[in-house]
Amino acid sequence: FTNDPYGWVDPITDRVFNIHMMGLWTTWIGWTDNDGESWEANPHDSGAPVNDHIKLGSGPWTNAGYGIGGGASSSFYETAVYFCYNKLAYISCYTSYDGGASFEVGGNLVGIATANGGLHGAITSAPDGTVYLPPRVATPAIIFSKDNGLTWEERTMGQDVGTPNPRKNGEIATDTESNAYNVWVGGDQGVYMSRSIDSGNSWDQTSIRVR
């Protein structure tokens, strides 16, 4: 049986991805380059269960980390493809050089805002190549990478509004100028947002109430 289906369209190549879990054991990753007329697939082995909250994304190669090879060689896919998921107390993220056919590099993001119930793997990419993850933690935070997933940094925000107990998933989005917007549920059950205009390096510390 399958569950947690998720779709993604690469904003640069127009490749359409379809992923879903096979229980909590492994993940099926499929893609099409002809608008669904035919599909290729990768029955990706996510390692020992439990694997949950799967997400796939893609974005430009950078000139650092995993991007050194990805952006320089014509043998690699035009964009970096990321597959992330939750493994109970931490998030796992992997990078593909071949458009999602395999995920050879990456691992568990241990020690970066992933303890305390970091139940999320919802990766988001920006046009400048920065990739973001919103962990489900007590203090609103963002994990981000500027080298296509080799290294990650953490930034916090929202200490003026906090989070509820039990916590809820947050979400992050980016715009065409690579500004980033993190949205989460505050301690009063309101929806709040913080913005970064410098590719994730700093975030508004006065939270904006959305609703």
Model-derived features: positions:
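Mobile, glycine-rich extracellular loop/lid and propeptide segments
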Residues: 1-211
